[in-house]
Amino acid sequence: MNGEGRYLDDYARELAEQGERAFRKQHAAPVLIVIGKRARKARRGSGVDTVTDRPTLHGLLHRVFPLPGVAAEGAGPVVIGRAEDDGVDVIIPEASISKRHCTFAVDAGRVVLSDCGSTNGTSVNGEPVAATPVELAGGETISLGRLQLTFETAPGFVELVGSMRTRSR
């Protein structure tokens, strides 16, 4: 999949046009949604990372990246990276993401995230992903380099998009 993803608003329109049943059927895989980027740590002060949504995200804010290979056991890992490379399944065009940054896979019915030895690291809810894969349930904040994303299961994504539609009425 290339880096030309769709945005949350596109999915909200699609849900309104298709109805929930058809939308659920069509979107049966988990997704990553860009929610911002980590601010650089201040040299003085608390040193706490914060998430910003400045326009420096170059069109990535609220972009949705489906993870279709994560929908079924035994499908093999889905590789996330920044460049078109052999074996990269989902391309996120952000300089702080490595060419082959991380993988998502299904293991014993659980979605797990592993770092591929990326230069700028991977974290889940602020905790670095070490050598052991991290289990995901949905709703986690994932940092890939400086980019902040949320991981949503397919049902969680449908619920999120549905809540957007309800709020906009």
Task: Give, region by region, the residue ranges found by the protein language model.
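Short linear Ser/Thr-Pro motifs
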Residues: 86, 96-98, 118
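Buried hydrophobic-core signal for structured, non-transmembrane domains
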Residues: 102-104
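C-terminal boundary/linker segments immediately following FHA domains
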Residues: 1, 106, 117, 123-169
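Intrinsically disordered, low-complexity acidic Ser/Thr-rich regulatory segments
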Residues: 1-92, 156-169
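Catalytic Cys-His active-site segments of thiol-dependent hydrolases/isopeptidases
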Residues: 80-82, 113-117, 143
